[in-house]
Amino acid sequence: MQGRRSAPISLVLGLVFAAMPALAAPPESREEAARKAAESWLALVDAGQYGQSWDEAAALFKSKVPREKWEQMVASVRGDLGEFQSREFLAMQYTKELPGAPDGEYVVIQFRAAYAKKKSAIETVTPMLDADGRWRVSGYFVK
C-alpha cells in the first residue's frame, strides 16, 4: 500500500520540477542589461578610474577619443563638479539610430546626479551593443 501512495506523489513532484524552468525569471531585457553596463561603467568613473573606464567603453567610443584625452577631459569635468554624492535613475530608451553615430543598438539612459559643487546634474549615458555582444558605453554627457 505504501508503494501505491508514493508513486502518485513522485509523479506530482516530477511534474512540478519539470515545470520549474517555465517559472524561472524571464531573460534580462536589453534595456536592463544596458543599464547594468552603464552603472558599472559609472562606478569606475565615480572612483576616479578614468583609464579603466576607457578600457571598458565601446569600440566606437575608443575610436573617437584617445585614452589620454579621455582621462584629461573627464578629470577636468569631474574636478569642476566636485566629489560624487548620489545618482538616481530617471529614464531609458532603446533606439537603433543616434545623430552622428552608425546604426546599431543603443540605450539612452538618464540619471540625476548630485556632486559636491553641483547638487543637480543630468547625466546621459549611452551604452551600445558592441561587436563582442556586450553592452558598453559609447557616450557620456553631463549637464
Regions found by a protein language model. Give the residues of each.
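Short, low-complexity N-terminal intrinsically disordered segments enriched in polar/charged residues
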Residues: 2, 21-49
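Second-shell loop/turn segments in exported
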Residues: 25-28, 39-43, 56-63, 112-114
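Bacterial N-terminal signal peptides
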Residues: 10-20
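Bacterial N-terminal signal peptides that target proteins for export
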Residues: 1-12
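Short solvent-exposed beta->alpha transition segments
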Residues: 35-37, 51-104
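Exposed beta-sheet edge and beta->alpha loop/turn motif
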Residues: 92-143
